Curated annotation (Swiss-Prot):
Species whose genome carries this gene: Shewanella baltica (strain OS223)
Catalysed reaction equations from the record: a purine D-ribonucleoside + phosphate = a purine nucleobase + alpha-D-ribose 1-phosphate; adenosine + phosphate = alpha-D-ribose 1-phosphate + adenine; cytidine + phosphate = cytosine + alpha-D-ribose 1-phosphate; guanosine + phosphate = alpha-D-ribose 1-phosphate + guanine
Keyword NAD recorded: no
GO cellular component, one term: cytosol
Protein name according to UniProt: Pyrimidine/purine nucleoside phosphorylase
HAMAP family according to UniProt: Nucleos_phosphorylase_PpnP
Amino acid sequence: MSLLEQVSVSKKANIYFDGKVASRSVFFADGSKQTLGVVQPGEYEFSTSQGEIMEVISGRFEVLLPETTTWQEFNEGTQFELAANVSFKIRNTAIAEYCCSYL
């Protein structure tokens, strides 16, 4: 979905990795939450506290999923799922955007 309707958006951004990754929290009437983020070129490691679905909105990510040794490519319009309490890495060579839905 390219448009989110009837939501509240946090004014303050979530800033990571010296400003190279930034996201905003989006809250829905049913209590669910998503984050919309922008990632500058680089390689980053993240950890989850709950399950997530990461959708690539624009650009391309290479992802090293938990307990794997091979980077996988995810392009615009694709997604990957992560369990709670895991770490994963992403890398990209150009600006990319994502939408994270929490399970």
